[in-house]
């Protein structure tokens, strides 16, 4: 049973990490800035993983754009998602740039042999310090329009889309990396606003995966959405009809601590409805979970999970050197870099 996505300590693959990645519970890995020095190094690292680990691994990253962009040197500096609507006055131009950003991000990541970037962010508004300019907009209609184009750009390249952070992280001030946030708004308001982007994109068949928030919505349930069967099974699966994969957000984050120790967090998230669990920046916890976590599931559930996982691997890959000579890449690189520079100047 492959469930966990774990991380690496540095820029070279270590023997003990190969052994961890080959564990039956491990489905893939997520890369961070500490794993990246330059293009040649990251290509070598990923090639080492593919060659030395004797099973297919889903290799992932957070390459959203703006401040959440793990790899920078030698790659397009993607603009923050808020910049499209904030700096561009023409709605058609806003949508075109969102499409270009989705295409460019997916093209560069798949050229590096990465399967999936956890994008786009579908949270409404910019007041939450953990979200901020990662959000497209504060209005659901505008957010949906821009997210549609971003995803269509990703899909053109063959990368699956992951909507996050369900049912919406945008209206809490606390940062779930540091603590468990609470959203005290009425259930009716959350369903009328925050859930609408997820609902619309699921209905259009544009979301391949969803990542829930480590947020407790006090008027709906007493557990974080990432460990809540109400949010994941009743709302996401049954009410919204979502059939794709559900990733937990990083269970190493402080916001997940409400669910207990690391084994308890994995157990609760899996039982609540997550298919794949991220556990990052906690190497001792990874060893602990691999030793002690004993999921009890039917064979049918395991087959469904594996099917969902298999659909997330990249559908195609352009050679890195070839990509950088393509007219689309060159044009996107120029326009997106300029927009990000304008955004940084705008924010001062």
Curated annotation (Swiss-Prot):
Marked site, Important for catalytic activity, at 175
Q: Which residues form the active site?
A: 177 (proton donor/acceptor), 249 (nucleophile)
Q: Which Pfam families match?
A: Glyco_hydro_3 (PF00933)
Identify the metabolic or biological route this protein is part of: Cell wall biogenesis; peptidoglycan recycling
Cysteine disulfide partners in this protein: none
Q: Does the keyword Glycosyltransferase apply?
A: no
The identity of this protein, by name, is: Beta-hexosaminidase
Membership in a protein family: Belongs to the glycosyl hydrolase 3 family. NagZ subfamily.
The molecular function terms in GO held by this entry are: beta-N-acetylhexosaminidase activity
Its annotated function is as follows: Plays a role in peptidoglycan recycling by cleaving the terminal beta-1,4-linked N-acetylglucosamine (GlcNAc) from peptide-linked peptidoglycan fragments, giving rise to free GlcNAc, anhydro-N-acetylmuramic acid and anhydro-N-acetylmuramic acid-linked peptides.
GO process annotations (BP): carbohydrate metabolic process; cell division; cell wall organization; peptidoglycan biosynthetic process; peptidoglycan turnover; regulation of cell shape
Q: Which residues belong to the signal peptide in this entry?
A: none
Indicate which residues the UniProt annotation says bind substrate.
62, 70, 134, 164-165
Report the HAMAP family cross-referenced here: NagZ (MF_00364)
Arranged from A to Z, the UniProt key words for this protein are:
Cell cycle, Cell division, Cell shape, Cell wall biogenesis/degradation, Cytoplasm, Glycosidase, Hydrolase, Peptidoglycan synthesis
What subcellular locations does the record give?
A: Cytoplasm
Upper lineage is:
Bacteria, Pseudomonadati, Pseudomonadota, Gammaproteobacteria, Pasteurellales
One GO CC term, this protein: cytoplasm
Output the superkingdom of the source species.
Answer: Bacteria
Show the NCBIfam families listed in the entry: PRK05337.1
Q: EC no.? A: 3.2.1.52
Task: Tell me which species this is from.
Answer: Histophilus somni (strain 2336)
Catalytic activity annotation: Hydrolysis of terminal non-reducing N-acetyl-D-hexosamine residues in N-acetyl-beta-D-hexosaminides
> What InterPro entries does the record point to?
Beta_hexosaminidase_bac, Glyco_hydro_3_N, Glyco_hydro_3_N_sf, Glycoside_hydrolase_SF, NagZ_Beta-hexosaminidase
């Amino acid at each position: 049973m492959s469930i966990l996505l774990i991380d690496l300590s540095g820029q070279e693959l270590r023997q003990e990490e190969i052994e961890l990645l080959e564990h039956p519970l491990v489905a893939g890995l997520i890369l961070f800035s500490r794993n990246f020095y330059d293009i040649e190094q990251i290509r070598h690292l990923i090639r080492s993983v593919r060659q030395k680990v004797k099973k297919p691994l889903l290799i992932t990253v957070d390459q959203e754009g703006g401040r959440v962009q793990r790899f920078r040197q030698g790659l397009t500096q993607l603009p923050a998602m808020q910049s499209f609507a904030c700096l561009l006055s023409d709605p058609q131009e806003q949508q075109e740039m969102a499409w270009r950003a989705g295409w460019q991000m997916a093209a560069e990541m798949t050229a590096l042999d990465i399967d999936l970037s956890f994008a786009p962010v579908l949270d409404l508004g910019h007041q939450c310090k953990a979200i901020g300019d990662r959000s497209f907009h504060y209005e659901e209609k505008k957010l949906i329009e821009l997210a549609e184009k971003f995803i269509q750009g990703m899909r053109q390249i063959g990368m699956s889309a992951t909507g996050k952070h369900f049912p919406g992280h945008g209206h809490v001030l606390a940062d779930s990396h540091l603590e468990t946030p609470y959203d005290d708004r009425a259930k009716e308001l959350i369903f009328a606003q925050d859930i609408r982007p997820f609902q619309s994109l699921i209905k259009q068949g544009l979301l391949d995966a969803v990542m829930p928030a480590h947020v407790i919505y006090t008027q709906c349930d007493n557990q974080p959405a990432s460990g809540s069967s109400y949010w994941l099974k009743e709302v996401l699966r049954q009410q919204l009809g979502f059939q794709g994969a559900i990733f937990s957000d990083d269970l190493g984050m402080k916001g997940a601590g409400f669910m207990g120790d690391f084994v308890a967090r994995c157990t609760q998230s899996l039982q609540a409805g997550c298919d794949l669990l991220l556990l990052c920046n906690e190497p001792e916890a990874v060893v602990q979970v691999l030793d002690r976590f004993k999921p009890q599931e039917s064979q049918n559930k395991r087959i469904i999970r594996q099917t969902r996982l298999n659909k997330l691997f990249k559908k195609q890959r352009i050679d890195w050197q070839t990509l950088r000579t393509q007219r689309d890449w060159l044009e996107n690189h120029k326009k997106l870099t300029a927009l990000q520079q304008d955004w940084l100047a705008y924010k001062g």
